[in-house]
Regions:
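Sec-dependent N-terminal signal peptides
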Residues: 4-13
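Generic recognition of well-structured, leucine-rich alpha-helical segments
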Residues: 11, 179-180
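Sec/Tat signal peptide C-region and signal peptidase I cleavage site
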Residues: 14-18
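Transmembrane beta-barrel domains of Gram-negative outer membranes and organellar outer membranes
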Residues: 19-151, 156-163, 167-174, 180-187, ...
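A mid-sequence, solvent-exposed acidic-amphipathic segment
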Residues: 186-235
Length: 312
């Protein structure tokens, strides 16, 4: 609860700072157009630096299939993963202001921790502007809390889903997304902190990771996407899981963004089995080298929920 209050306070302070800087802006200064560094709210596994304007809401569906190849893939094992469902997420994200977004979602989850409910805030503190050297990049802060509503296993088993109480069912992510568009190419760097309230003995409650993402248009409506995360783990934690025959791999995704009239469709390939950062940062054990990557897609539709009267 203290962490949740800290996150809310953090966004309140940042929002107040943003309002103050707007007030003291010189009215005679030349106005520049905001640069749209990424087109969507998500790259593949990673969030993007973008936020929705005030009153705009998106409805999104993410779907991760089973392994394409490897021991659990191929024609005879689930027809290249299409017969299996690793994870599904359905969510909404709405612009409360032109900088602050609120999101809520439900994800199936993969592995031991399932039945996940997410809420989060996304605040864009800085915006890159076209032909303005004073605003060379965009910076967004994202924070969430995820609750697992699944039935807990026996606490004597000491598994990661052997929840002891309501508080132990939660995990939180705080992420800073920094991005810049160079001509047609968009690059993003996103360091991340993950805290999991309950972990099995030998695992780490606190993890740091760093991610990166790229976007490169191949045509007006067909775009190449890729993202990658590396999680920093202690050697003792690595040795603990290795003794149980578990090895971790960095999540990597590559895919295509297809922009259609009214919808944005992503066709992706990734070794991550979970959709939420709270899970794939901690527990990606699938390897591209062993064929343990999967088809995935994201479908997004934007709606106007309310209009900003000041913008008229």
């Amino acid at each position: 609860m203290k962490r949740l209050l800290f996150v809310v306070l953090l966004f309140t302070v940042i929002n107040s700072f943003g309002q103050e800087t707007t007030i003291i802006k010189t009215p005679t200064k030349q106005e520049f157009t905001n640069t749209k560094v990424f087109y969507s709210q998500k790259v593949i596994n990673s969030k993007s630096v973008e936020v929705h304007p005030k009153g705009i809401m998106d409805f999104s569906i993410d779907h991760y299939f089973g392994d394409i190849a490897g021991d659990n893939g191929g024609v005879r094992h689930g027809f290249f993963g299409l017969d299996a469902i690793k994870d599904v997420r359905i969510g909404f994200q709405i612009g409360l202001t032109d900088r602050l977004n609120f999101l809520i979602a439900r994800a199936k989850g993969s592995g031991f921790v399932t039945n996940q409910y997410e809420w989060g805030l996304k605040y864009q503190a800085l915006r890159q502007k076209d032909n303005d050297p004073g605003h060379p990049l965009s910076l967004t802060i994202f924070a969430n809390d995820v609750l697992s509503a699944m039935k807990a296993t026996d606490t004597a088993l000491h598994l990661e889903n052997s929840f002891e109480d309501f508080g132990s069912r939660h995990s939180q992510v705080v992420q800073v997304l920094v991005a810049r568009k160079f001509g047609k190419l968009s690059l993003q760097l996103n360091p991340l902190y993950l805290h999991t309230n309950y972990v099995e003995p030998g695992a780490e409650e606190d993890l740091f990771a760093v991610g990166g993402a790229i976007r490169l248009p191949l045509s007006k409506k067909f775009v190449l996407l890729a993202d990658y995360f590396h999680t920093f783990r202690s050697q003792s934690s690595i040795d603990f899981f290795a003794s149980k025959g578990i090895g971790f791999h960095d999540p990597f995704g590559i895919g295509f963004e297809i922009i259609t009239e009214g919808h944005v469709f992503h066709l992706n390939f990734t070794n991550a089995t979970d959709i939420l950062e709270n899970r794939f940062i901690r527990g990606t054990t699938s390897s591209w080298g062993d064929g343990e990557f999967r088809w995935a897609f994201t479908l997004t539709r934007n709606f106007v929920v309310f209009r900003d009267k000041k913008a008229k």
